[in-house]
């Protein structure tokens, strides 16, 4: 290279070659976690943030509810509801749910159902719908209304078919002999003038546009049986006894099938669980095994049930259920996500099992008619 030539960009500032002063790292400031004394939210606060004050009140209501002081919790929730801004939808829904649950525990089921119906009308996503259905389930379980409890579980399972705990609850509901809905209480929280010995007319049951919990407009099966028996008791007793026995057997089959599906779901989920979640899973599987054994069904019957109830179960679906996203949709789409009736649900899940037992049932009916 000739003298005097220079390379473009080949010049450097002298500061590049200077030794930089050594930096001594300062010790990081110690982390100080905020320590809260037990029941700190009962202390007087000078906070000027209205939302912060309302949040403290909600904590007080939640603690009272946990202690089963439902009247006190209801007072806290009600005072919050009056002061909450209309734009705070999340807390408003939480508070309203708390109010409804307190009312149910206090025996004010009609008011609880009215609040549940209001939450239902404002549901805009699958999480909202799940909360509404769980709320209805709590109210109807408190009322010991077997028919409506089962329908709530059908709707929950239609929304979350891979949830094993809902299937366990459904099995329990099928085996419970609870009475029907008390007179004067309608499924949607409105007064019903229908008497206890008549079918409830369509006009007496609130089923607003797009209602998610459209409940049957007839009395539960046990009420219908009692009405029929009162007409000609002597003539109908053998027939009623047979029907009652068949209904009990069908309920046992549905309960067993529900437990088998719950066990299949738990078995698939256990590989992704640890600690207390895994312990609960394994303990529940053992309990299910004991209950299934108590049904005394034949082994080939149990295999048929297990095959029918596990047709849609694949590991990929379990992962999707565990990490599912909240779907924000309109009321019409939410309504389409749940079943319209128990018949629709049972046709989907138990039809194959029922068809397996139909020949035996038909043969039984023929034998009864010949003997008669």
UniProtKB/Swiss-Prot annotation:
<feature type="region of interest" description="Disordered">
    <location>
        <begin position="183"/>
        <end position="212"/>
    </location>
</feature>
<protein>
    <recommendedName>
        <fullName>Uncharacterized protein C8orf76 homolog</fullName>
    </recommendedName>
</protein>
<dbReference type="InterPro" id="IPR041404">
    <property type="entry name" value="DUF5588"/>
</dbReference>
<feature type="compositionally biased region" description="Polar residues">
    <location>
        <begin position="187"/>
        <end position="196"/>
    </location>
</feature>
<dbReference type="Pfam" id="PF17826">
    <property type="entry name" value="DUF5588"/>
</dbReference>
<dbReference type="InterPro" id="IPR011990">
    <property type="entry name" value="TPR-like_helical_dom_sf"/>
</dbReference>
